[in-house]
């Protein structure tokens, strides 16, 4: 089987994105399993190599088919969109935000055209995007906008623990208000379809509880009885294999041990804490509901260490590996 082509947008050039890209691609294993193609700026990549003490060749191409895809060589579609003399490492800049956006935009164009098999993204900075006038708050929103996808789903995976999120970047108070029967049912249907597109044909789901001990039949809250349980019952009527609500202090442990194929977390930090405590560096984000496969590192731009060469590339390597794992079975719309 031919190795999949994985597009890697370099991320915010003022952050650690370029450094983790060159570090990951210095690992020959990435070339044994994939054909990595970086979308970015040649000067930024060479600077990142200098930060990390690496010497790799940069082979610029205009389309994926021109890549060499061999160890020691970084194949790059050079957008030449960063003025290095003006770039300040570890700082929010409109130029950096615009460059990061253009890298994502090009990667999506390649994926939509079927020229790459997946995208593995690197960190971007929301403030830099805002400074550049980009009207989207993060990767998921940008990818949805560029591909025309409505409300893409975020899934975290660490080892065999997969976690979906009923809500993302909203306050905890608002997240509780978003726990409704209608929303939970909609997400169970969509999450099931998302896993099937990744090759998990008959997934078993668990829904996490919201309150302590899943509410103890109304003693500590009634969302489980009044909202979640009816959603689970309705999902079962549609043929979805789902259990719950399972108390949040145990459901993720059982998921890690293989009791479920995926868990629906009811708010952002509930699932984030669970996955990152298993292994912070090896937690990978997967965006479902797009017309292409996208994985991502699960950390930010780390401005505090940008330019030091200290950033770990483990999450980048794991994002590439997971893209390779799902690419053969991924089903487009």
UniProtKB/Swiss-Prot annotation:
Assembly, per entry: Homodimer.
Function: Catalyzes the NAD-dependent oxidation and subsequent decarboxylation of D-erythronate 4-phosphate to produce dihydroxyacetone phosphate (DHAP). Can also use D-threonate 4-phosphate as substrate.
Signal peptide: none
Binding sites annotated in the UniProt record for a divalent metal cation: 169, 213, 268
Superkingdom of the organism of origin: Bacteria
Organism: Heliobacterium modesticaldum (strain ATCC 51547 / Ice1)
Annotated residues for binding of substrate: 139-140, 276, 294
Cofactor(s) essential for the protein: a divalent metal cation
Keyword annotations of the record: Carbohydrate metabolism, Metal-binding, NAD, Oxidoreductase
Name of the gene this protein is made from: pdxA2
Stated family: Belongs to the PdxA family. PdxA2 subfamily.
The protein's name: D-erythronate 4-phosphate dehydrogenase
């Amino acid at each position: 089987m031919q190795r999949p082509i994985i597009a890697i947008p370099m991320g915010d050039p003022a952050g650690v994105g370029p450094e983790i890209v060159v570090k990951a691609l210095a690992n020959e294993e990435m070339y044994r399993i994939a054909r990595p193609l970086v979308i970015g700026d040649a000067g930024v990549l060479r600077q990142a190599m200098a930060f990390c003490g690496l010497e790799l060749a940069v082979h610029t191409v205009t389309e994926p088919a021109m890549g060499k895809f061999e160890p020691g060589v970084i194949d790059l579609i050079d957008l030449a969109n960063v003025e290095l003399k003006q770039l300040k490492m570890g700082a929010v800049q409109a130029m950096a935000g615009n460059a990061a956006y253009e890298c994502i935009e090009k990667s999506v164009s390649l994926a939509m055209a079927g020229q790459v098999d997946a995208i593995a993204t690197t960190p971007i900075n929301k403030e830099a995007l805002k400074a550049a006038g980009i009207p989207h708050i993060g990767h998921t929103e940008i990818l949805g906008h560029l591909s025309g996808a409505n409300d893409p789903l975020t899934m975290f995976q660490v080892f065999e623990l997969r976690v979906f999120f009923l809500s993302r970047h909203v306050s905890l108070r608002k997240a509780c208000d978003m726990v409704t029967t209608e929303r939970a049912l909609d997400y169970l249907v969509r999450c099931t379809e998302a896993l099937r597109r990744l090759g998990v044909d008959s997934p078993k789901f668990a829904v996490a509880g919201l309150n302590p001990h899943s509410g103890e039949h109304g003693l500590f809250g009634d969302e489980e009885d009044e909202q979640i349980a009816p959603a689970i019952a309705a999902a079962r009527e549609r043929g979805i294999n789902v259990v719950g609500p399972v108390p949040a202090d145990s459901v993720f442990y059982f998921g890690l041990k293989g009791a479920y194929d995926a868990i629906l977390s009811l708010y952002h930090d509930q699932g984030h804490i669970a996955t990152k405590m298993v292994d912070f560096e090896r937690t990978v984000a997967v965006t479902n509901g797009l017309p292409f496969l996208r994985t991502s590192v699960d950390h930010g731009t780390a401005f505090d260490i940008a330019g030091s060469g200290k950033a770990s590339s483990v999450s980048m390597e794991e994002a590439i590996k997971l893209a390779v794992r799902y690419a053969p079975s991924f089903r487009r719309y």
